[in-house]
Structures are given as C-alpha cells and as structure tokens.
Amino acid sequence: MTTTKTTMLATLWMATAAATIGLAAPAHADDTPVNLPMTDDVRAELVQAGAVLTGRPASEFSGLRPGKTYYAYEPNATNPTYWAAAALAGPKSETAAINLQDQNSYMMFYKGADPAATWVPIAAGFGPIPAGEQPCPIPQSIRDVWQWPTGKCYPPPA
C-alpha cells in the first residue's frame, strides 16, 4: 500500500510539474511578431549602433528621440530577428548635429536572436521611404505591430 501511495503521489507531482512547465511556455509559439518594451540596455545598444552611421562616438548623443523608438521580435522559425527603428537625439557637438541630418535623420536596425549578435544599423533618412519605391528593410508584419501607416516605411506623424 505504501508503494502505491508513493507512486500515486509521484505521478501526481509529475503531472502538476508538467502542467506548470507547460503553462510557462511563450505566449507566441507561432511566427507572429511581438512588440517589445524598450529597455535601457537595448536603448544603449541602439545609440552605439546608430553612432556608427554618423561616424561620431556614441558619447556625443544623449539617447534616442522620445516617441519615435520602436522595438520588436520576429520569431521566424528559420531566421528569428529583432527589429528596431529610432532616431538619435541630443547631439552634444555641432559635428554630431550635422551628422544627424538627411541620411542619418532616422535609422532602422536588426539583429539575429543569437545572444552574441549585434545590431546592424541602416540609414533610412532623406525622408520617408514609400514601400515599393525602395524596399523597406523592416518587414510589413513588424510595421503592422508598430502601427505604422499601411504600406509605408516610416512611423506615423507625432
């Protein structure tokens, strides 16, 4: 009888543990993109990557422009990717300010899901890129999550 009680308790415990582990699975098990909150660490990484495009050190910028920063994850089974779009803000020198004009006025970024991956910046300035005229580097599914205008490659006006 003791063996049966022990076996039953062990079975019940394992079933409970399995159910608990199953409930902890990600809410998006499919390939649906997920909008992510911008963290201080990601913000610092984007400033660093964006500064590369300007040719100026990241220390010459105070951060990212509020209200124009986006961050998402695309859990694609073959190529999971993080996406971001932002504008550097608070240039601390005239040269840094000049380098944020035109081509560098808005930037898009991507990186793979590997923890060692780094952000790849893309200059998207010179005004908005209408989808179709020039391929938008950010997939439409991500732009939809960010609620950008349909078929456009830029955020909605503030």
Language model segments and positions:
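Secretory targeting and sorting signals
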Residues: 1-29
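N-terminal low-complexity, Pro/Thr-rich disordered segments
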Residues: 12, 23-40, 129-130, 148-158
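Feature targets compositionally biased, intrinsically disordered low-complexity regions
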Residues: 21, 49, 54, 62, ...
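Polar low-complexity intrinsically disordered regions enriched in Ser/Thr and small residues
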Residues: 25, 53, 58, 66, ...
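Short, non-transmembrane alpha-helical segments in secretory-pathway proteins
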Residues: 31-72
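Short linear motifs at secondary-structure transitions and domain/linker junctions
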Residues: 59-62, 81-87
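Structural signature of eukaryotic scaffold interfaces centered on beta-propeller domains
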Residues: 75-78
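Extracytosolic low-complexity repeat regions of secreted or lipid-anchored proteins
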Residues: 83-158
